[in-house]
Amino acid sequence: MIEDTMTLLSLLGRIMRYFLLRPETLFLLCISLALWSYFFHTDEVKTIVKSSRDAVKMVKGKVAEIMQNDRLGGLDVLEAEFSKTWEFKSHNVAVYSIQGRRDHMEDRFEVLTDLANKTHPSIFGIFDGHGGETAAEYVKSRLPEALKQHLQDYEKDKENSVLTYQTILEQQILSIDREMLEKLTVSYDEAGTTCLIALLSDKDLTVANVGDSRGVLCDKDGNAIPLSHDHKPYQLKERKRIKRAGGFISFNGSWRVQGILAMSRSLGDYPLKNLNVVIPDPDILTFDLDKLQPEFMILASDGLWDAFSNEEAVRFIKERLDEPHFGAKSIVLQSFYRGCPDNITVMVVKFRNSSKTEEH
């Protein structure tokens, strides 16, 4: 009896293997189940299919909108990807800043104005940190306020002062670097930052730059006028200075001082400062506003300039000055959309002679 039972079970097992579990049989079984589900549960299946189709259409529509919309109104769908955003708006100046694809936000910016009393020129600053946010935050929180105090003192007795906007800028930038280096060295913090500062008075625009943040101005004819020049290791002047100091530059994705830093001047960076291969000395330029009759200026971290040329950025903003952020938000989003991996900060300042703006 037991032998007969075992024989029967063995036969059933062979039937299962050779007939029911054959690929053709399983395929027909799946088709049969699908047809049965459709005809006997029509409403549920049709709802699932319709929802899937609607979802696909929505995604395709959003992608097409992003690809075709030059003004980037449809890019709000991407904003969920930004871990953090910052923005600032005050009648003639707008700032938009995103952390973007980086794990940390190391960009900082500052705006200090006194349009009512005009006790000092307007102060605009961009600080792009590296190696952590310590240096950028330190400079942002101290340098603009220090400039404000010294500029107010200067304005009270300008006629008798031997100082100028240029000398005040240079003195305060170098002073903040020395002060910060003392603190960073004690804590072994190797952070550094760029420093782009613009002083805007009634007749002049004075711009100081350390590093590779950049300023560009749009003049009355729509031309892009550089307000600063990047400090890069591959530039002949910088390369010679680094070599004289006993340093070197090497290529690792970009030209770097001692194979480390992708700019030749910065604030902070105490290990490279100790070698004197990276310096904090600013380049300072002054522009005659009556001569240029500018419409606006752009101050930005290198996240923008990795995606836009000076001329392209000016054209882009010029077409969007009527937007709430004067085009700053749109150009930041466009830089992100073009694949920029960095933090991106853009400040747009409209001048008094530009449309819908009556004063600095």
Curated annotation (Swiss-Prot):
Its main location: membrane. Binds 2 magnesium or manganese ions per subunit. Mn(2+) 1 binds at D128, G129. This is Protein phosphatase 1L. Interacts with MAP3K7/TAK1 and MAP3K5. The chain crosses the membrane at residues 26-42. The gene is Ppm1l. GO terms for biological process: cell surface receptor protein serine/threonine kinase signaling pathway; MAPK cascade. One of its GO terms (cellular component) is membrane. Pfam families: PP2C. It comes from the Eukaryota.
